[in-house]
Swiss-Prot record:
This is Spermidine/putrescine import ATP-binding protein PotA. The gene is potA. Residues 125-304 are annotated as: Insert. GO terms for molecular function: ABC-type polyamine transporter activity; ATP binding; ATP hydrolysis activity. It is found in: Cell membrane. ATP binds at residues 57-64. It comes from Malacoplasma penetrans (strain HF-2) (Mycoplasma penetrans).
Length: 594
């Protein structure tokens, strides 16, 4: 199911656009480190209150960076992190409505389990009982006054920012409306140097002398001044008019002048963009101002810290929920990885955050404990009803736990959807290969919403109607479990079995059809080099654009794939050679029999 903003919602969950507004909105978030490394680029997504969202991707894709920016451990280079429509990206960690469970648990080694869990409660406050109604009114009035001041300040800031944006637009128009400036603007440094070298070479071939020696001293002096101004980042440029009759000299001077003007204009644009970005901080500050001021006011007259007894009761309650009874006095070093994880979860949940951030919390656990903790997380999410944001590289974990999955690669979002959509309807070849196992095959989209695959003309699912051009080359994905091993009369293709692996419930087969490798699952055992027949349902074919730009692998995985394919190609040759020998021997045998 999709919302009007095309946000994908899990059809099995209780969420719908009608009754649950966006709780967290990530808008145009970018993170570039001082060394120039771009961790995430133009990230946008929304999260509903109470959703379990997983950010999934390989190492280095930017998923943990996003989690850290939501939690306040990293500051974005640009963009907004909205919670209930208020930008929190500049708020300190302790003022954010989040709690984080780290990959290494980050338990205090000098505190026992009980004290670790209680630590965050020392700063939690609760309303004072039987408080005067006058204080309540005073608090409300103070908040409204702060809100009024906040709106006025934000209005002034928006006016300033609009001015900066108009100036930026004027400078961009200056470049775009000039043919020579626009041309130079699209050039790289190498391309520009190559253009100048070409002009100098042409001039030398025509006049048998160096070009710069023919340029008047006055022009060269002005060029020297402009270069000096540029070096010291002074946004000024001394204009000059060259009364040169030689066309090559005129062209050279025109490009040099355009380069200088373009450089200065871009510096001005960068400066104005920086000023506009600075204003984002103040918008965020004034949006949060009334709430922080109210919190300060309430601390004095309306709220109090928890008593020792109340803290003890809260700790005992969460210990019972998480399953840590009997471990209260133990030290973190005395606990197993699974138990340490429970303590970290208890410490985060006891403060009742609106959002729980989970940074690959199960990655250090063994398979059995990890499976148990996955179920625990699911139960805790259901019990507390708060928003969970999990970061992981484990596809099975993401598919098992999530209402929504955000798939990332190389700092960009590849797809957002429910587990079913991500698995059955991947957005591109990269997602198809990353999530589970996939057979990605070459096919042709035909008129009448049909697909030509392996010389079979098949009906495509109705969802693909008018999505592709007639006779367009496409990729078709079929998951291993969607193939059925059948008899000859029902089979669409005949394949040769190259490898069999027993997986417990199923056999995994790697087969060959006309040089194409297929991975499939079968209930019954088959023999190596056996020929079997396969079929599949039309709705099991997922059609994608061919040669998608996202269809990339890491060097390590591409090397592995190449080695695997080469090994099977060798095996295919051996099988074919063996078959040919058998045929030849069979014919010889027939002759001998005669």
């Amino acid at each position: 199911m999709k919302t009007k903003d095309n946000e994908v919602i899990n059809s099995e969950s209780e969420f719908s656009e009608k009754d649950v507004p966006n709780f967290i909105e990530i808008k145009k978030i970018n993170k570039t480190y001082p060394d120039g490394y771009v961790a995430v680029k133009n990230i946008n997504f929304e999260i509903k209150k109470g959703e379990f969202v997983t950010i999934l991707g390989p190492s280095g894709c930017g998923k943990t960076t996003i989690l850290k920016m939501i939690g306040g451990f990293e500051l974005p280079t640009s963009g907004k992190i909205l919670v209930n429509k208020i930008d929190i990206k500049d708020l300190p960690i302790q003022r954010r409505p989040t709690a984080t469970v780290f990959q290494d648990y980050a338990l205090f080694p000098n505190m026992n389990v009980e004290k670790n869990i209680a630590y965050g409660l020392t700063e939690i406050r609760k309303p004072i009982e039987n408080v005067s109604a006058d204080y309540q009114k005073e608090s409300e009035k103070y908040f409204n006054d702060c809100l009024k001041k906040s709106k006025s300040k934000i209005k002034d800031i928006e006016r300033k920012r609009d001015g900066f944006l108009k100036d930026i637009q004027k400078l961009e128009n200056k470049i775009n409306n000039s043919k020579i400036l626009s041309e130079v603007n699209t050039m790289t440094e190498e391309e520009y140097e190559e253009k100048i070298e070409t002009l100098e070479k042409e001039y030398f071939e025509k006049n048998k002398k160096e070009l710069h020696k023919s340029i008047p001293v006055k022009v060269k002096f002005i060029e020297f001044i402009n270069n000096t101004l540029s070096f010291f980042r002074i946004n000024k440029n001394i204009d000059f008019k060259a009364n040169e009759t030689d066309e090559l000299v005129q062209t050279y001077l025109k490009y040099e002048k355009a380069y200088r003007v373009n450089l200065i204009t871009k510096q001005e644009i960068d400066y104005l963009n920086h000023k506009a970005a600075d204003l984002d901080y103040w918008v965020s500050y004034w949006q949060n101002y009334p709430y922080q001021e109210k919190e300060w006011f309430d601390k004095k007259k309306l709220t109090r810290k928890l008593t020792k007894q109340e803290i003890k009761e809260e700790v005992q309650q969460i210990i019972k929920i998480i399953g840590l009874e009997g471990k209260e006095k133990k030290w973190p070093s005395d606990l197993s990885g699974g138990m340490q994880q429970r303590v970290a979860l208890a410490r985060a949940l006891v403060i009742k955050p609106e959002t729980l951030l989970l940074d690959e919390p199960l990655s250090a656990l063994d398979a059995k404990v990890r499976a148990q903790m996955q179920q625990e997380l699911k139960n805790l999410h259901k019990k507390f009803g708060i928003t969970f944001i999990l970061v992981t590289h484990d596809q099975e974990e993401a598919l098992t736990l999530s209402d929504k999955i955000i798939v990332m690669s190389q700092g960009k979002i590849q797809q957002i959807g429910t587990p079913n959509e991500i698995y059955d309807l991947p957005a591109n070849n990269w997602v198809a290969n990353f999530i589970g196992k996939a057979n990605i095959l070459n096919a042709t989209y035909l008129k009448g919403n049909k697909i030509k695959l392996f010389d079979n003309v098949l009906n495509a699912d109705s969802r693909y109607k008018d999505k592709f051009k007639e006779n367009e080359e496409v990729n078709v994905m079929i998951r291993p479990e969607d193939f059925d091993v059948v008899g000859k009369d029902k089979g669409k293709i005949k394949v040769t079995v190259l490898e069999t692996t027993y997986k417990g419930l199923m056999w995994e087969l790697i087969c060959e059809f006309e040089g194409v490798l297929l991975t499939l699952e079968a209930v019954n055992k088959v023999n190596l080099e056996q020929e079997i027949y396969l079929t599949w349902d039309d709705e099991d074919m997922h059609i994608m654009k061919k040669d998608d730009e996202n269809d990339t692998y890491t060097d390590e995985s591409s090397e592995f794939l190449a080695l695997t394919k080469n090994a099977f190609k060798k095996k295919i040759k051996e099988i074919k050679s063996k078959k040919n020998k058998n045929k030849v021997n069979g014919k010889k045998g027939d002759k001998n029999d005669n």
